[in-house]
Amino acid sequence: MSKFSKKFISASPFKQQDPTGQNQRNILSDIEYKSDEFLGFPEEKARQRTDEYLGIKPDKDGLMEDQNSFEHGDTARHYMGGDQLSRSIREKLGSLGKTSLGRIIGVIGSNVGGLVHEAQNIKEGRPILESVEDATNNFVGSLGSLFSTNTSTRILDRLKKYLPDGKVKD
């Protein structure tokens, strides 16, 4: 377990064990968490990039507005998630990550990770169309990772009005 994980878990006011028979861990959540940890928590990095992109700053109490409350917030979050996961995979590949093959591996890995995440959401009862929209934004973000971070952000600026919003009514 990483230092980040230990610090987070030890600081939690909630008991870290599930009540017997409830919220059983499953293979998808295990894969998602272990991958996130192995890759240096790209989901958290994507969240921070999205906060910066949307101009979200903590209030006087340290609380922050929900990204989904902003126009294009969900779109940006999934785009940045796909972008950041691809970059994190490429970083793990070392010098191979800077090659065309490494970039392709990053894009493919990012999309596999996004699909595992969305499969988990469907299993938890989220609407299928919402996951399809989110996976679309993850895919476009993974392609954005083929460019510099600044260029990728400019691509999001241009495409966000055309991408799905990821907000589906139940």
Positions of the model-derived regions?
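Gly/Thr/Ser/Pro-rich low-complexity intrinsically disordered regions
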Residues: M1-Q22
